[in-house]
Amino acid sequence: SAILIGSRFLLPSGQTYNGLMHINFESEGGRQAEVYRLPITGGENFLYLVEPGVYRIAPTRSVFGFYQEMMNVVIDGRQYRLPFPRDLLRQPPYTIKASKIVAMGILEARVLPALPGRQPQLRIRLDDGVSARRKVVQDTIRDMMDPNLSPETRESTIAWSRALQDSLMNILSEEQKRTTYKPAP
């Protein structure tokens, strides 16, 4: 089982591919909980292998296991510190089933323009709409067929091709579940 997440780093001047942030992906269970620290760099899609279970997005932890309230984001060589976004904490739990891929969406870090003499603000959100999840899966499928990849990398990604295809079909079926009639008042 795996999760698929994309990233986008936006400056006032446009998108950059030079960025880094970390989030945790954690299950319930106290000491026995599965905890994955996910590094996310700019403009890429990441396929992270996880154990089956129910997981939530969480702030990263310190060396001693305490949650870090502040999130560090590096964009174009500049470091930003901000409180971990509540929108990410409020995301519903993700149920990860064996040999399935869950497309989470695109994690977006946007630097807002600042007035002269003030620090720019940073907003982080997870774009988990159907179109964003579809784009992440389609881009991953396209990237895994790149002839410039090493044979070992291509073999490992092709092993996930069936799960990626199933994930894409599920997303497309969500997109087509629109009502074709006007409901009665």
Please state what every model-predicted region is:
Residues 42-56, 60-65:
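Short Pro-Gly-centered beta-turn/loop motif in secreted/extracellular proteins
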